[in-house]
Amino acid sequence: MKKQLLSILIICFLTQLIWAKKIIIKMATLAPEGTEWHGLLVDLGQNWKNATNGEIQLRIYPGGVVGDERDMIRKMRIGQIHGAAISNEGMTEINPYFTTFYMPMMYQSYKEVDFVRDKLSEELYSKTEENGFKILTMVDVGWVYWFSTEPLFTPEDLKTHKIFTWAGDYKSTQLYEKHGYQPVPLAMTDVLSAFQTGLVTSIGLNPMYVLAQQLFAIADNMLNMKWGNLTAAIIIDLKTWNKIDSQYQESMMAISKDLGDGFQAKNRYESDMAVGVMEEYGLKVNIPTSDQIDVWHQLIEDMSPDFRGTVINEKAFDRLMVIKKEMESH
């Protein structure tokens, strides 16, 4: 009897040791299940598990079930989740240099996106770590366009619309209001119902997300003009990261980078495919004239002083303007 009891105790002790080594990383994202961004996380989790002999396991919370991106950052800080796959909207809560990606019409080619990101690499990565988080991989998800319930071609047209802005981003809301626009702050998870009820009638968003959320059924007009570039990152809080064995950290970083590079190479051009699919189901792609595009550029030039210190952090804005001049001289 004593031998049996001893055997049971030994088995329980060994089982506890085995499970004690396992680290479960809870990671949230707004991306719905079945999207490419969600698929990247699934692949990431499987590869991490294989590379760490099952000691690191990724538990994914998709579709905004944890809340908006600001909610994700808050919950990471208090330990409810450990990681997130988020856009620059969430990253600006951690690192003000991500506000540089808010500059409208700054980027018109992926060459320009790569140029700016390369020049800002040190600030983007190091400042994030200084604030308690580690970037595992950083990619751009694609171009941002204006989607609306009625056609819009000019800034004056946009003034007739109720514009989605992120809940909590009061600086963008104030900036829009100052220049005569009608911003409506909401959580991204409430966008579909907001369009259905008429609370919102326009949004600047990436076509892949519009397709995934079926927003084009209501916001069935797209202005074919690159308004911005959606940058995203997969991050983990440093407290969790530092619990992981250093040899596994190296493998996990390599896996994250490889998967991120592969995702970007493929999905930089998925936006065009998403637009094509939506066109088959009634999306109207409205092409602005060169004169109309000039009006948009003039708007950005006029608003530029107001971006500094509001939507875009002062130091980040000044750094971006230096990079912009350098980029234009190439």
Name each model feature, range by range:
Residues 21-112, 128-330:
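N-terminal secretory/targeting leader peptides
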Residues 14-20:
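Sec/Tat signal peptide C-region and signal peptidase I cleavage site
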Residues 111-125:
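A gly/proline- and charged-residue-enriched helix-loop-helix capping module
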Residues 4-14:
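Sec-dependent N-terminal signal peptides
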Residues 5-7, 19, 165:
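Intrinsically disordered, low-complexity segments enriched in glycine/proline and serine/threonine
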